[in-house]
Amino acid sequence: MAVTPSLLRLALLLLGAVGRAGPRPQGATVSLSETVQKWREYRHQCQRFLTEAPLLATGLFCNRTFDDYACWPDGPPGSFVNVSCPWYLPWASSVLQGHVYRFCTAEGIWLHKDNSSLPWRDLSECEESKQGERNSPEEQLLSLYIIYTVGYALSFSALVIASAILVSFRHLHCTRNYIHLNLFASFILRALSVFIKDAALKWMYSTAAQQHQWDGLLSYQDSLGCRLVFLLMQYCVAANYYWLLVEGVYLYTLLAFSVFSEQRIFKLYLSIGWGVPLLFVIPWGIVKYLYEDEGCWTRNSNMNYWLIIRLPILFAIGVNFLVFIRVICIVIAKLKANLMCKTDIKCRLAKSTLTLIPLLGTHEVIFAFVMDEHARGTLRFVKLFTELSFTSFQGFMVAVLYCFVNNEVQMEFRKSWERWRLERLNIQRDSSMKPLKCPTSSVSSGATVGSSVYAATCQNSCS
C-alpha cells in the first residue's frame, strides 16, 4: 500500500525525534504519542455517538461505524456520506473545512477497495497541504534520513571488510590494531543499532499507521522491546564515543611515553571502551523507567535525565579535542625541526589535521554544547545535518585511514600477491617440465634447484 503524504509526515515526526534522542524544543511539532492519545479520545467520543445516536427510521442503510480513521453515521443506500476531517490529525487546523467521504452501495453495504477488505475512503480534503512542502521540516528530515542511511550502510560495509583484513593477516596482530578492531566493532554496532531502530519504525508504519490502526501502534511504543531497541542504540552510540576516546588516549600515550606495557594498558582500554558506557547508560534507563516512562524513550522532556548520558559523552569529546590540539602542536614542532619550507609545513599540517578529525571525532566539538532544546529553525537543521552526515560516514573514513591506505596493510597484500604469483609460476614450471624425458640426474637436479630458489624467495618475501 502506498504511503500518503500525511502518513509520511507522521513517520518523519518520530524519525526526527529519534535521530538525536534529545529534549524537544518548546513549540516543536506534535509527537506521535500525543497524536495517538488524541486518536483514543476521538475513538471514545465516536463510540459514545454510535451508542447514543438514534437509528434511521426504516429501510435499508449502511451501519454506523468507526473505521479507525473517522466516525461514520448511518448512510442512506446509493449515496456518498461525508464527515469532517478528524480533529486528532496533527494538521487538523489547516483542514477545518475539509471532509472525508465514503460510499454506501445500493445493497446497504459500505464500498470496499478492489480486491481488499479495507473500506474505500476519499481522504483528499484531509491530507496535509502540499504548499511549501519543498522546504518543510519533514522534507528536510527525509533528506537527512536518506543521507545517514547511505552513510551508515557504506560505513558498515567498509568496516566489515577492514575488520576481516586485520584479522586475516597474522603479522597485523598487535595492540594498535586490536584497538582499531574494537573501534571498528563500535562503529559496526552503532550502524546496526540505527538500522534496527529504523526497521522498528518502518514496521510500525507498514502495519499500523498505513491502516490507521493507531491503538496497535501505541501498544508497540509501550512495549518493552521498543524501549530496549532505543536503550541498545544509546549504549552503542556511547561505546563508539568512548572507543574514539581510547584511540585518542593511546595516540597521546605513544607520543608522551616511550616505554609502557601495551598488554596491561589494552585491558584498561577494553574496560573504558565497553565498560564505562554501561555506568551511565544503565542508570539512564533506570531513571527513564521510574520517572519518565513514556513512549519509546525517544525524547527527553526532563533535561536533567538526558544529562546522565550527555555529560559523559561531552567529556569524551572534550578529551579527544585536547588530544587533537596536543598532537597538532607536536606535528608543528617536528615539521619546524626538520627545517622545511613554510609551504611544505602548511601542506603537511593540513594533511595531518584532516586525517585526525575523523579519527578522533573532532568535528563533534562544533555543536557539542548546543543542546537540542536550544537549537531551532536553521540552526537545528544545520546541527542535525552536520552531526548525522559526518557521524554516518565517519566509520567509512576510519576504515579507509586505519586499514585501506595503511602502509602495513598494503605491504601484507603485496606479500600475499607475490606469494601467490611465485607459487603459480612454480606450478607452471613443474607442469611444463613433466612431459620432457631427459636424463634423470640433470632434470631432477635442475628442478630441485629451481624449486629451492622459488621457495627461498617466497620465504624471504614473507619474513
UniProtKB/Swiss-Prot annotation:
Topology, Extracellular side: 22-139, 202-227, 291-305, 371-383
Entry keywords, A to Z: ADP-ribosylation, Cell membrane, Disulfide bond, G-protein coupled receptor, Glycoprotein, Membrane, Receptor, Signal, Transducer, Transmembrane, Transmembrane helix
Maturation and modification: N-glycosylation enhances cell surface expression and lengthens receptor half-life by preventing degradation in the ER.
List of residues that carry ADP-ribosylarginine: R348
Residues glycosylated per entry: N63, N82, N115
Subcellular location: Cell membrane
Positions of modified residues (ADP-ribosylcysteine): C341
Family under the similarity heading: Belongs to the G-protein coupled receptor 2 family.
Protein name listed in UniProt: Glucagon-like peptide 1 receptor
Species, as recorded: Rattus norvegicus
